[in-house]
C-alpha cells in the first residue's frame, strides 16, 4: 500500500471539489490516505462514502510524501519529513514576493495546465525542473453526452462566480449587442459568489437585468450537487466564458463532456482542453490590462484585456450558434466529447500516482 499525507480543503469551493475527486480516485488505487484538513471539512453528501476513510485518519505518516492542494501563497506548511508536493491553482501570469516564497517551499509542484507550467518556469526559473503538469478532470459518471435540447429557443449559459476576472462585467454587453428583443434566445447565469454580500450581488444582477434583453436573462442559484448541475447543462446549447484569466475552468470542461458548444477566450488555463476544433475561440488581440476589481485583485498585476475586438468576436459566435440552431444545423459537439475523454479524474490521479512514484 502507498501512503500519502493529503493536505487540502473539503467543502463547496473549487479547491474542495477538486480535493474530493482526487481523494475518491486515490482510494480506488488503494492508497492509504492520511488527511490533514484546511478549514472545517463540509463534504457534499455524495462524496461522504468515498472519503470517509481518509477523513478518519488523523495520524499522518512522518515519512510519507505529502500533497498539499492549496493556493500559491499557502504552501509554506507541510507535515512529516517526506517529499513535499504543492498543487496550486492560479490565474495570473505573475507572482508577488509572498507567493514566490511559498512556491519555493515544496520539493515539487503539480500544476494543472501547460500554461501554468510555463508561468512557473518563467517567473521562478529555479523551479523549472520541479514542476509537472497534472490536469484536473470531470466526473464521467455524471457528465455524459446527451442530445442538444429541442427547444426553439437557443439557450446560452455561463457558470462561475460573479467576478470581473471571469468577464461578468462584459457579458451583458456582449449578449445585448448580439441580439434584439425579438430573437428567441435565453442566457442562463449561475453566478453565486459566497464572498459577496447581498448588496454587491444585487449590483451585479442589475448589470444584467437593467438592459434591453434583461428579460431574457435567467439567474439560478448554485446547485448543491453535480447531478443537478448536469441536468441544467443538458438544457443548454452553448456555454459562454469571456474570461480574462482562469486557473482551470471546471464548468467549461463539463460542458464539453456533455457535448455542448463553447464560446471562450483563448488564454490561460482552459487552453489545456479548449482548441479550435472543439470551441469557438475568442482570440485575445488586445494585450493586457491591470488586474483590478477592488475585491479579489488590487491591480498589482495584469490579466488579458477585453476590448471591442474581443467583444465583436464573441457577438459573431453567439449569432452564428443561434443561426445554426434556428436552421436545425446545430448538432452535438462531438469534438468536445472526444477531448473530454482525456480529462477524467481517473486520469488525473493516474498522473499523480505516476509522478509520485517517479519522485520517491
Please give the residue ranges for each predicted region:
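Extended catalytic core of nucleotide-activated donor transferases of GT-like folds
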Residues: 5, 40-125, 227-228
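Nucleotide-activated donor-binding/catalytic signature segment of Leloir-type glycosyltransferases, i.e.
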Residues: 198-227
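Acidic anion/phosphate-binding donor-loop and adjacent secondary structure
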Residues: 97-98, 137-153
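Short alpha-helical donor nucleotide-sugar binding micro-motif in glycosyltransferases
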Residues: 230-236
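A charged, aromatic-enriched C-terminal amphipathic alpha-helix characteristic of glycosyltransferases
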Residues: 305-316, 323-354
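Short hydrophobic beta-strand element within catalytic cores of glycosyltransferases
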Residues: 261-264, 280-282
